[in-house]
C-alpha cells in the first residue's frame, strides 16, 4: 500500500516528532504567523490530525510587528515524566523559549525565556536526568550571515525553571558544509547521535549526522 506523501500537506516546515506510547506528535515552524506552532497527532504515522497550537494567545511570542523572517523557528518537541516540552526560537522576538504542557493539545505555558543565544534549540536527557540544550550558533538578530556562525553548541539547563547551568561549549562544526543548524541529539545504545542540517537553505541543503560515545565530543 502506498503511503501518503506529504503526510501533512501545506505550510508545515521544520517538523520535530516525539513518540509517547502508541501516540506520535509533530510540531512545526510558523515564523511570524499566529496561532503558532501547530501540534499534530497520529497513531500510524500516515494519518495526522491538528489538535492544537502552542502559541495561541498574546504574550507567548512577540507577535505584533515581527516581520519575515522572524517568529517561530525550528521547534523541538519532547516528552519526559508526564510533561510535554517545546523549545523554539522566537527570532527577532523573545529569543529562545521553553514551553510546557501536560496535554499536547494544550493549554501550553507562557514560555520561559532561556538565557542562551543561537537558533533551532533542541532538548535531550542523559540517563541520570540531566537535560541538555543544543543550539545552532547564529546570533539572534545578527545580520552577519554565515561568517559569524560557530557550529553547534550545548549547555546544561534546568528543564523545570529554564535556568542555564553552564557556559555554552562547542559540540560540532558539521561535516564541512557551511552553517550547521537544526540540531537534534539522540542517545541510542552506546552512542550519542547529532543530526543536523547543513549547507544553507538553497540547492546545497543537506542532512548530516555525527556520533560519539561521549556526549561532549561528537565526531
List where the protein language model places each region:
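Carbohydrate-active catalytic/glycan-binding domains of CAZyme proteins
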Residues: 1-219
Amino acid at each position: 500500500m502506498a503511503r501518503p506523501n506529504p503526510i501533512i500537506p501545506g505550510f508545515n516546515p521544520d517538523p520535530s516528532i516525539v513518540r509517547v506510547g502508541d501516540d506520535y506528535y509533530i510540531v512545526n515552524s510558523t515564523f511570524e504567523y499566529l496561532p503558532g506552532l501547530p501540534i499534530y497527532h497520529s497513531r500510524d504515522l500516515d494519518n495526522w490530525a491538528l489538535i492544537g497550537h502552542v502559541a495561541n494567545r498574546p504574550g507567548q511570542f512577540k507577535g505584533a510587528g515581527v516581520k519575515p523572517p522572524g517568529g517561530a523557528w525550528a521547534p523541538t518537541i519532547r516528552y519526559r515524566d508526564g510533561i510535554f516540552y517545546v523549545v523554539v526560537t522566537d527570532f527577532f522576538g523573545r529569543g529562545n523559549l521553553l514551553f510546557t504542557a501536560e496535554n499536547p493539545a494544550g493549554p501550553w505555558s507562557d514560555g520561559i525565556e532561556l538565557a542562551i543565544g543561537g537558533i533551532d534549540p533542541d532538548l535531550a536527557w542523559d540517563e541520570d536526568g540531566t537535560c541538555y540544550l543544543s543550539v545552532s550558533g547564529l546570533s539572534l538578530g545578527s545580520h552577519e550571515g554565515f561568517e559569524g556562525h560557530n557550529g553547534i553548541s550545548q549547555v546544561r539547563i534546568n528543564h523545570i525553571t529554564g535556568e542555564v547551568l553552564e557556559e555554552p561549549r562547542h559540540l560540532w562544526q558539521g561535516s564541512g558544509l557551511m552553517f550547521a543548524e537544526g540540531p537534534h541529539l539522540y542517545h541510542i545504545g552506546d552512542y550519542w547521535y547529532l543530526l543536523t542540517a547543513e549547507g544553507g537553505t538553497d540547492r546545497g541543503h543537506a542532512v548530516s549526522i555525527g556520533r560519539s560515545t561521549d556526549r561532549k565530543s561528537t565526531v
